[in-house]
């Protein structure tokens, strides 16, 4: 049994430092690197790719809305043509750095409000997926487990890593509980690890109302921008390995 651990990294910008990339990188297997539109800049992108190479961590692009002030967490209405080309542009930017460092670009995971918008907007999802296929049909698309965009990507011939979230509560329909609602974010590391093991080994987890929901867990997102990020990432990895689950980059088992 195999699973990937991913985290959103490279989200500093200019003089502003965000996240604990160097520490979190010790425990994950795939890094989603910001591509300059919601966070990140050329220097940060190259530094993050180099760090991933040094740590043996696979690299993926983490494109978002062009919204530095809002950190890509504010919805923007895009035409399909805009969405397709925005994604292609951002993937290409990160690919320049992975190529310069002798690395392959493993995956693409949309960021923040864009990620959430894809779940609700099939036309937008198709446009984003087309932007990915324009770049390389062999690349892995990381998307919310069981969601319609994941299905569309598979229908369009892309490899998909179904993603679950370590520290987030789920609605009965498999979507994430909005951050502002009570109980949306889980902070207890033992509970987080228990839920992660359930998702990987049992194929599901209890929703916020106690109802069991089925989830395919190819990759687990651990957030790298909170004070307990390193502690939680280390604990999750240790518990998974103690359970006999191999923690490896998604590219090793997503075919």
UniProtKB/Swiss-Prot annotation:
Name used for this protein in its record: 5-oxoprolinase subunit A
HAMAP family: PxpA (MF_00691)
Pfam families listed in its UniProt record: LamB_YcsF (PF03746)
UniProt record similarity statement: Belongs to the LamB/PxpA family.
Group of enzyme by EC: hydrolase
Quaternary structure note: Forms a complex composed of PxpA, PxpB and PxpC.
Gene from which this protein is expressed: pxpA
Keywords: ATP-binding, Hydrolase, Nucleotide-binding
Reactions the enzyme catalyzes: 5-oxo-L-proline + ATP + 2 H2O = L-glutamate + ADP + phosphate + H(+)
């Amino acid at each position: 049994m195999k699973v990937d651990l991913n985290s959103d990294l490279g989200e500093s910008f200019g003089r502003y430092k965000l996240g604990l990339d160097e520490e979190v990188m010790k425990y994950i297997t795939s890094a989603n690197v910001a591509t300059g539109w919601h966070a990140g800049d050329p220097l940060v992108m190259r530094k993050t790719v180099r760090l991933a190479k040094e740590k043996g961590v696979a690299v993926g692009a983490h494109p978002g809305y062009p919204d530095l002030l809002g950190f890509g967490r504010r919805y923007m209405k895009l035409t399909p043509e805009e969405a397709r080309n925005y994604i292609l542009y951002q993937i290409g930017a990160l690919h320049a750095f992975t190529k310069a460092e002798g690395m392959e670009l493993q995956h693409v995971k949309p960021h923040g409000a864009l990620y959430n918008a894809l779940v609700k907007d099939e036309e937008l999802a198709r446009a984003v997926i087309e932007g990915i296929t324009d770049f390389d049909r062999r690349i892995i698309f990381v998307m919310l487990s069981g969601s319609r965009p994941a299905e569309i990507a598979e229908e369009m011939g892309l490899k998909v890593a179904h993603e679950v979230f370590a520290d987030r509560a789920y609605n009965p329909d498999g979507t994430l509980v909005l951050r502002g609602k009570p109980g949306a974010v889980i902070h207890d590391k033992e509970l987080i690890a228990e839920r992660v093991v359930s998702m990987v080994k049992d194929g599901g987890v209890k929703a916020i109302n106690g109802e069991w929901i089925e989830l395919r867990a190819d990759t687990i997102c651990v957030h790298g921008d909170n004070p307990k990020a390193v502690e939680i990432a280390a604990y999750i990895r240790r518990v998974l390995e103690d359970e006999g689950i191999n923690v490896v980059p998604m590219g090793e088992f997503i075919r």
